């Protein structure tokens, strides 16, 4: 695997999706091969699963069903899009990956981080990210951003109460303790330009290590 797999994680409203696109543009302008993608989604089958997962009408969805659907979408996305790009030497920037399942379903939904990790290890094998950038923001501020952004696509997770999003944040904090070697936290409460600068520093360090 000759590429660099970087995932962007964080609670709702952290701004990672916007920053990811800007990072892609900057790295591409520098002459690097970059592919941006997202989860759940990124390819046709996974996008169809995304519609089921995030549909606001699916309020009866069981937490285990939710976790399994995410893992299924992740597997297809990985083998169809992410892995081929890495094999071609691309920098892959992915908006959410395994850690979202661990924080949301494993911790916030109460399924257990280890249990959800087991499901996802079956789905992705040893294809863990090289680097994970965590966008740190107060959950309440993140939700305010969501509802202030009229153009943002609202989904079922946005309808969860603040308590759920606080648990998601706690879940990510637990993951940073478990995987300190790949997690890098940036302050998402800053201006977008400062967040972009901080993320670029993380990526530059990763590029130096692998000399891509």
UniProtKB/Swiss-Prot annotation:
Any Gene Ontology CC annotation: cytoplasm
Enzyme Commission number(s) of this protein: 2.7.4.9
Catalysis performed (reactions): dTMP + ATP = dTDP + ADP
UniProt GO molecular function: ATP binding; dTMP kinase activity
Keyword Kinase recorded: yes
Entry's family note: Belongs to the thymidylate kinase family.
HAMAP family per the UniProt record, alphabetical: Thymidylate_kinase
Protein's name according to its UniProt entry: Thymidylate kinase
Species: Bacillus subtilis (strain 168)
